[in-house]
A protein has these predicted regions:
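Secondary-structure boundary motif
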Residues: 83, 207-210
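N-terminal Rossmann-like NAD(P)+-binding subdomain of aldehyde/semialdehyde dehydrogenases
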Residues: 1-152
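Conserved small-residue-rich beta-alpha loop and adjacent elements
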Residues: 127-208
Length: 210
């Protein structure tokens, strides 16, 4: 898609919508889009698709990071997202207010409340409800079936594609957290009404990890 294909003129104001790719912020105005609801123009960088795919001959980045450490990190991310001084969240709301049908005050509240998911007890509950033995996320767990046959089981990091809605910033937070807890390699398809929240969360995480 380019400027001509969506009927833009040079006078149109364009909102920047950067990507976050393998730990790096990617900015640019190579591709112009229109938001579905308000018809606002926003620009994204053009990226080499090979960079999006994590090489299969490399170990997934989170595979050997303990689950407890991942949850600690997610909890700190939640605290940073609730911080009124977080520049990435402020910038996200500023941009989203231009492309979204919801009022700015509602967007601000949704973004703040989304961070409530990053609660230690809640995150542990999510893991325990989905994994009979959460230790399998960190190590090989011995098993024995009814015949006495022994084996070892470990949850291997999956490759996940998340298709995110544009009317709920909380889904971005949940998707990032759940993908992290199963140590996945994640690709997020973002909505035209909110191509900003996911990037703001990831930038906050990268700032913690500096």
């Amino acid at each position: 898609m380019n400027a001509l294909s969506v009927g833009l003129t040079p006078a149109d104001a364009v909102v920047s919508a950067p990507f976050f790719l393998r730990g790096e912020l990617c900015e640019g105005q190579d591709v112009i889009h229109r938001s579905r609801d308000l018809g606002v123009a926003f620009a994204t960088p053009e990226i080499a698709l090979d960079r999006v795919v994590h090489p299969r001959n490399q170990v997934p980045p989170l595979l050997n990071v303990p689950l407890a450490e991942i949850i600690d990190f997610l909890v700190e991310t939640g605290q940073r997202l609730r911080d009124p001084g977080n520049p990435f969240v402020r910038e996200c709301v500023d941009r989203m207010a231009l492309t979204h049908v919801l009022p700015r005050a509602v967007l601000e509240e949704q973004t703040r409340s989304a961070a409530a998911y990053l609660d230690r007890r809640l995150l542990r509950t999510v893991v325990e409800q989905n994994f009979p033995d959460p230790k399998a996320l960190d190590e090989w767990v011995p098993k024995q079936d009814f015949t006495g046959r022994k084996s070892f089981v470990r949850a291997f990091a999956p490759r996940l594609i998340h298709v995110l809605p544009g009317n709920s910033p909380g889904v971005a937070v949940k998707s990032i957290a759940q993908g992290a807890m199963v140590k996945a390699v994640n690709l997020f398809k973002m909505s035209s009404s909110d191509p900003f929240t996911t990037v703001a969360v990831l930038r906050t995480m990268a700032d913690i990890d500096r």
